[in-house]
Amino acid sequence: VNIANIPGGCILESMKITIFATQMKNTLALILLALLSFQTTRASQLLIPMDEQQAEHLKAYGIAYWSLQNGVPIEWLLNYRGGSFLCPNIPTLSKECTIRGVTFEIVADAQAQQIYAQIADPEVNMERVKLEVAPKIAVYTPKGKQPWDDAVTMVLTYAEIPYTEIYDTEVIQGELVKYDWLHLHHEDFTGQYGKFYGQYRNAAWYQEEVSNQQNTASALGFSKVSEMKRQVSINIRNFVLGGGFLFTMCSGTDSYDIALAAENVDICESVFDGDPSDPQAQQKLQFQNGFAFQDYRIIKDPMTYEFSTIDATEEHNRMGEINDFFTLFDFSAKWDIVPTILTQNHTQVIKGFMGQTTAFKNDYIKSNVTVMGQTKSLGSARYIHGELGQGQWTYYGGHDPEDYRHLVGDPPTDLALHPNSPGYRLILNNILFPAAKRKKQKT
């Protein structure tokens, strides 16, 4: 048809009909989407209980992460049955729960509304938090380390939560901006190689680690490992200042804080860096640069397996395994939502576990730090949290929550034997924390 032979009015009418048809099509699509949304709202939901009824607490976090990865937002019901997850009842999600052995319940919409009403009651210490986007996770760990060398990588692997390994080179090169959440392997950020010199200086693994660290420092343009670790520490601090989430355990806590406080002073003896430490090192510490601690004394002796007076390992060692527990604080879910998220658990009393840094003496914790778990009888904190700039950080004392006295060379913990570990749950609370759409803290 030659469009030039069609009267202009007909063309106009034809265009109007086409536009009308397109509008009707779009309208019908919106109506259909609305109907589907209505049906989804009216449909049943999938509840992943996190109380004693849950068979696989640790893998349940993996299900939550998997759901977010696949674009399905879920709700974290804080303090409801141990911090349960409420998800859309999607066949693929229930199938994944079954495959991983995670306990779930199908609840009708009316029942879900009752749960919401219970949580909304101002007299009830519960809250709903929407989880929206799976955080990008980085683990700062030396190349060649196995997952069982570190509790966090071990539980991430068990829970089937993906992560990327990075180390000094990547941090120095500015790659932290790619991630939302960073865990520090049980590292020594002071440049003293973990203070293992006294006992292991002749061990092949120790000598290899020293050599690898020195080679990396040289390749990155640093004359000493301590200088490289100092810059790594500063870059991590900038990551938190810019909105990142930092989680670290064991010696990655106090050694990191000390490295920040010693930013402008040499605290390493000659066996570590080839020159003596500053004799005025203690007086030159700048505690304000650290995240959590102040007024402690550093221990420079290479033969002493300790960084400072912060650590409460000796006190916990005297207490003994049978009596070593720490208690989680009970926070207001509607007012102090951040520590509430980080302390979700199915028990409030958790068995202790040793590490190079086991716990933190209360005397050295800054006043603006939130203590979330403590052993009151010893005056020590196990689990602490704080804010810096736009970001957040969490320190957790001890090495392995299911191995009371983990020693160098010990076999890995089999988490299949500890699927409900309360101590490991605290790690995974931190993993999901960046995914939460948080309300502004009111206290």
Model-derived features: positions:
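Helical hinge/lid and interdomain linker segments adjacent to catalytic or ligand-binding clefts
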Residues: 45-46, 51-55, 85-86, 90-95, ...
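Extracellular ligand-binding/catalytic regions of CAZymes and related secreted enzymes
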Residues: 44-86, 364-443
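Hydrophobic targeting/anchoring helices
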Residues: 43-150, 159, 398
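Catalytic beta-strand/loop cores that center a nucleophilic Ser/Cys/Thr
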Residues: 150, 157, 254, 273, ...
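Intrinsic-disorder-associated, low-complexity terminal segments enriched in Asp/Asn/His/Tyr and depleted
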Residues: 2-5
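Bacterial N-terminal signal peptides
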Residues: 27-37
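Catalytic cores of eukaryotic secretory-pathway lumenal/extracellular enzymes that build
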Residues: 261, 270-272, 281-282
